Amino acid sequence: MVYNCGTRLERRKKRVRLKLKRNSSLLRLSIFKSNRHFYVQLIDDKCGRTFASASTLEREVVALTNRRVNSDSVKIVAKLMSDRLNKLDNCKKFIFDRGLYKYTGIVSEFANELRSYGFEF
């Protein structure tokens, strides 16, 4: 008998989230990407609160990137997110939740850009 445990992407998402739950004391930086947009949120899972967010839908990003999701637009989103995280107290270390996406392309570009601003994950 064969059991369908979901698609490959759903299994990867579950596997990544399970590993993240082990370190639930830290805040979680969650990303979502589509073919047209890139979204980032800093979430506290204990109280279910979002502290900061940034995306390619914001005016600063749309004006510079012409509604394209590429490494340039992701770098601008990383800059926006780092500015918002610097305003918060004690948010230099968190968990990077890549979700169902592989750590290549714009996901790794975003992570490296945030690390260059002094954040640890």
Swiss-Prot record:
GO terms for cellular component: cytosolic large ribosomal subunit. InterPro entries: Ribosomal_uL18_bac-type (IPR004389), Ribosomal_uL18_bac/euk (IPR005484). GO terms for molecular function: 5S rRNA binding; structural constituent of ribosome. Coiled coil: none annotated. Pfam families: Ribosomal_L18p (PF00861). Keywords: Ribonucleoprotein, Ribosomal protein, RNA-binding, rRNA-binding. The keyword RNA-binding applies. One of its GO terms (biological process) is translation. Gene3D superfamilies: 3.30.420.100. Part of the 50S ribosomal subunit; part of the 5S rRNA/L5/L18/L25 subcomplex. Contacts the 5S and 23S rRNAs. Belongs to the universal ribosomal protein uL18 family. This is one of the proteins that bind and probably mediate the attachment of the 5S RNA into the large ribosomal subunit, where it forms part of the central protuberance. This is Large ribosomal subunit protein uL18. It comes from Ehrlichia chaffeensis (strain ATCC CRL-10679 / Arkansas).
